[in-house]
Amino acid sequence: MKTIIYNNIKKACMTLCLVGSLASCNDYLEYKPTAVVDEQQAFQNPDEMVNSAYAMLGDDWYGYPFNLWTYGDVASDDALKGGSGTTDTDYHQVEVFTTLTPTLGHLDELWYHLYIAVSRCNRALVALQDNGEAKLGAETTKQRIAEVKFLRAHFYFKLKMVFNKVPWIDEDAYRNNSQEQIKNDEYTAEQLWDKIIADFKEAYDVLPATQSQGGRVNKVAAAAYLAKCYLEKGWGDGYEGSTGANFVNKEDMKKVVEYTDVVKNSQYGYLEDYGDIFLPEHHNSKESIFAVQHSNYEDDHTTYGRGNWSNVLNGVWGIWSCGWDFHKPSQNFVNAFKTHNGLPQFNDYADENAHPVNGAPSSQKWDPRLFHTVGMPSFPYKYEGAYTLTTANSRTPNTYGYYCSMKEVPQRSKGETYNSPWQSFAMNDYVIRYTQSMLDRTEALIELDRFVEARQIINDIRQRAANSINKHISYAANQCEISLYPDTYFQNKEKARLCLRWERRLEMGMEHERFFDLRRWGLLSTTLNNYFKKEQNDEYNGQKYAQYYKGAHFTPGKNEYFPVPYPQLYYIPGLYSQNRGY
């Protein structure tokens, strides 16, 4: 009996120990690791999910710059890559085209990170749809959905501009887990624009004209972006032979005018001095309709700050401690600022190379915006005499010449956000500024034969440039000359287009628009192939540079868009198709 009782007690104890062990194991299995986001919990906080979508606006890097400086400028006649030589980063392929292939890693990085941004937006939309009203209330939820639709359209705009054939993945695809079943040629170019426009239109219909929190998108920004979309859509599909002057859709141009009416009659406007636009103390001024916000570590008390890492390579050699001297203005671009009697030298601007020298005025005069845009030897770097540029401030002059870009970096005395081993700046990135929107409007007005209105806008912009001498660039005053266009320059569409296109190049120079402008107008192959022939023979003080352009060639019907990255094509074989010619 004692043995039986003892055995029963022993079995009971063992059972209790086993149950206890299972409970302990279960506790360990249910342990929630730290520093990891729980998806279900995250979806319970829809406003934080919206913030995560906003955070992607500036979550880029020089290998995948969301401002597209390499694809908008380096791929055009405005800029050279820069750096220590042609093998410094893989962007050399982008500026010569002949070696450009789908295996370029930077293309895959850009595609991948832009789709991370799209995914953030889709997750935020699901969180808002499921938990928004309970957590935020109906009205705030409606507005947050509109904001996220704006952000998603913004990221798709970037994807469409670079890659053309991209899969439209929305919140329904995320819910259904069908992202890997959506083809990138499911929609035509026009249909894809319509999808992007629909997101911006929903944002426009809901958002207020002003927001109490800086950085949040608003109705006017949506209107400006809608105008940009209709402008791109209204010229054709982007490929030469099916885009340009013979393919302009007048109804789309009317939409551009309609939405820029909203911008024109809003709280935004021209900043009085052109140079102020690119100084950090004037961030979020009336010129700034939509900009990616950046900060330094002193502002947000973090180690690195929310710096602009897309421009991390673009500091000037020898001026900045980590200036790597990328994004170099071309001689052709500098020549475009030449004036005669205050007006552009349309026909002979590139016949002879020239550059101003500080303190040595000549008969050649210049549009004053040159001195706000391009850093040149003998002139103060960004208005500060203590940092005067010399030929030593070019890292590889025998390859990339002696000019430097000034708009995207602050004055040297203002310092950087972070400077070792990489350098970032707290400069906001303009996505749309007021003048750009007015140039969009002007382009549409010309296509609608409204030349008087178009001339007035361009002359307003030129008058601002004329007023932008004494405050910052008085040292170049005797080298500047700019006049307003007389009505004879706007007597017909051909003349008006020439004035608009020239003005856009000067006003928006080095702001990552040029390649896309030339594509829209159907002028890429003629412009770039002529540029390659000329720039390879250019000299600066007797020294040739840009010899690598001898191997450059733009192929129409192919190079208007960049290739779909190889890893994306072969992640799910057969799902995606390649762009023409690659």
Question: What is the predicted function of each stretch?
Answer:
Residues Y28, P46, T101, L114-A117, ...:
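Long, intrinsically disordered, low-complexity segments
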Residues D47-D60, G85-F163, Q181-D194, A198-R216, ...:
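Conserved, well-structured interaction surfaces
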